[in-house]
Amino acid sequence: MDKTVPLGRVKGTLTPPCSKSYAQRALAASLLCGETSVLRNLEFCDDTRSALRCIETLGARVKHVDASTLSIEGGLHPRGKVLHVGESGLATRLFTPIASLCGMPVTIEGQGTLLRRPMHMMIDPLRRLGVRVRDNDGYLPFEVRGPIRGGEIDVDGSVSSQFITGLLLALPLSQHDTTLHVRSAVSTPYLDMTVDTAARFGVEICHNDYKEFYIEGGQRYRPAFFSIEGDWSAAAMLLVAGAVAGEVTVKNVSMLSKQADTAICTALVRARAAVINDEDSVTASHRPLRAFEFDATHCPDLFPALAALAAAAQGESVIRGTSRLEHKECNRADAIREEYAKAGIEVDTSQEDVMRIRGGRIRQARVQSHGDHRMAMSMAVAGLLCDGEMTIEGAECVAKSYPGFFEDLEKIRI
């Protein structure tokens, strides 16, 4: 599906979808609880549906109380031998350790761009925790068979924190205590979200500055009443739209959130946008924007939003952390460079771990999403400033995280 975004200004108030990162963690914790939990404020993007499908396959009984509320009776009693994670990297790395709690073989399958994303970092740690793994050269599909044991192991945290999240949620139910020695942990705010979610279900996880995690075995997940907060990754795109093309207020978000992408507000301030923070909303509005420097190592999902912000700013912006982008839905560093070049914006990624973006006039262009939801949204925001229209090929991929993005953007056009 192609989507065309013409030059225009925006003004209005929007509520983003719920945090899919929190939603998937809460769904997993509800599965691991042997009683009934209630999750509120859920909205169903593709990734959240994948997680819901996973917990049902692994034994959860789910009742839809209303359009945004689920009652979930947990318990690991697999109903099948195949766990289909869709195109969700988090669901893959989260539910593989959880499936390894079972004493039966479970095959993890995916689709689309996920089949090109490496999963090798899970294989050796799982084997050292007693899981039998039938490998596929580090890619999906593969088979795991538990039970997963505790122990003391090293885990590489330099590529992603998602597998560590899966271990942290699964290992409290193992028979033995576990110490994880984590090398070069990245995206540490996401680990904070995991520890927070576990705590809200009565499970304790301790860590030493993300270098060591201690997980006591034999714990029990307790039922929770869990309200999912708004998604800061989605909010970031909307706030950048306000900063470059008018004024946008985003509701149901708080700067006190543990979500990594609250950091977008720091970038907006550095770019000299006007930012107002209220108790449950944030507003960003346009002022003449200047080039900025920002380190996105621990919030790599912000890169596409930061690219749109930098393209609208005067001067050369410097964004660090590009090493985190290779194994997303696409190689995001390459995609940002290629697609923004079509719109006349120079993006330099020749320096290791650094992206330089020279802001300027954004030209009318026809660009590709690369099957990446955040790239599609980034180019749409840039389209608000182009000298004609920005046409995005493959725009349907926004359904992965924010199905109503283009409709919401249209609502606030003036």
Describe the function of each predicted region.
Residues M1-I414:
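Structural preference for solvent-exposed beta-strand-turn elements
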